[in-house]
Amino acid sequence: MKTSDFNYHLPEKLIANYPLNSRSSSRLLVQSTTIEHLLFKDIINFFQQGDLLVLNNTSVIPARVFGNKESGGSIEVMLERVLEENKALVQIRSGRSPKIGSNIILNSLIVKCIGRQDSFFILQFDRSPIEIFNAIGHVPLPPYIKRPDEELDRHRYATVYEDKTQQDSVAAPTAGLHFDNTLLELIKNKGVNIATVNLSVGAGTFQPVKAENIEEHDIHSEYLEVTPEVVDMVLETKKKGKKVFAVGTTATRALETAFMDESKKGFCGYTKLFIYPGYKFKAVDRLSLIHI
């Protein structure tokens, strides 16, 4: 299957650089046997009592930091994940890659580049990387949003159901940005069960697919946790003939990874699951994707 088969034209004027005041007033396209153009709040009409809605409760780290190399050249550091108490795996954008053993200055803080791992770099900090990025980091807006991050993004580039103790993602699970508390309560009152999984969205989510054939793409790995209780909820939902709705590709990747194991006892670890046309879904019946 050619990667070019997935190309399409997206005019820049159709990209919303700022969110609407009301999360659930965003536009919603529904594809089944027909295509409908609705508002996101209308998604409630597609749920039935006994269905299951699965959310990714991850929280976003302000994962982008700007600084300079020892030579004075500018540098951009994008956190991928924390490796140890004071070490992190990062992407680096610069005219020239930093040398192993060299220092990088981030907002007057000196960190050391101590190694490489494929296209990523390993940096050593003098304290917790999460603490540092929370203090001086910028919200990592998607590359298609052509503006600097602002204070409002710390709130709006996050879901209303995020778990602050799960601050482990460098990008938001964007399909969930359009649920507000009122809509979630209405869905719950309709008799829909709600479950959460956790998948740490990595910087690889921003990497383009360069392989000529989609099957040859080396997709990035991500850490996830799906509890045995959530697996049981999925199994019970299907047993009753009801539907499992996953909010976004991250929740989908988490659930489908958990159901790759025949024991179906939950999953905790890294996944490289790559879903493309032809994949047979084991857990998810309905998928809610990114919305405009």
Regions found by a protein language model. Give the residues of each.
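A cross-family signal for N-terminal binding/gating loops and helix N-caps
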Residues: M1-I290
